[in-house]
């Protein structure tokens, strides 16, 4: 009787040990709010907020949510290399179209505060960026 109870307790502990890492998963690696900056030089930086969603089939999202939000038109993640590609079209202060092309690499994948670094093109300006998941 004692032996059966001990085996049950041991089995329960093993099952919990196996299930615990699965409970710590955060879903799609890009899902969430990301903040950081981009710029053409170290002195010329622009704050950015990126909100990304995963509906089970596609990545969607917005650059700088709010009154001047820019919805993403294309968003991809290559899980083999963790390469991220985002495209959007917004407007500048004069109302003229501005194309966004963002290419980066997802890093620190095992942590909640993972980050993406890479190249940010906004209109005719090109620079680097780093964003961290909040």
Language model feature labels by segment:
Residues 25-134:
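Central antiparallel beta-sheet cores of small beta-barrel/beta-sandwich binding domains
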Residues 1-11:
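Bacterial N-terminal signal peptides that target proteins for export
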Residues 10-21:
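Bacterial N-terminal signal peptides
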């Amino acid at each position: 009787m004692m032996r059966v109870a001990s085996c049950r307790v041991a089995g329960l502990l093993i099952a919990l040990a196996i299930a615990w890492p699965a409970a710590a998963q955060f879903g799609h690696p890009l899902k969430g709010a990301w903040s950081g900056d981009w710029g053409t030089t170290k002195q010329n930086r622009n704050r950015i907020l990126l909100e990304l969603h995963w509906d089970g089939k596609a990545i969607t999202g917005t650059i700088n949510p709010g009154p001047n939000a820019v919805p993403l038109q294309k968003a991809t993640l290559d899980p083999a290399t963790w390469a991220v590609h985002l495209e959007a079209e917004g407007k500048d202060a004069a109302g003229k179209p501005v194309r966004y092309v963002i290419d980066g690499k997802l890093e620190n994948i095992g942590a909640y505060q993972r980050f993406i670094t890479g190249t940010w093109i906004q209109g005719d300006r090109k620079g680097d960026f780093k964003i961290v998941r909040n």
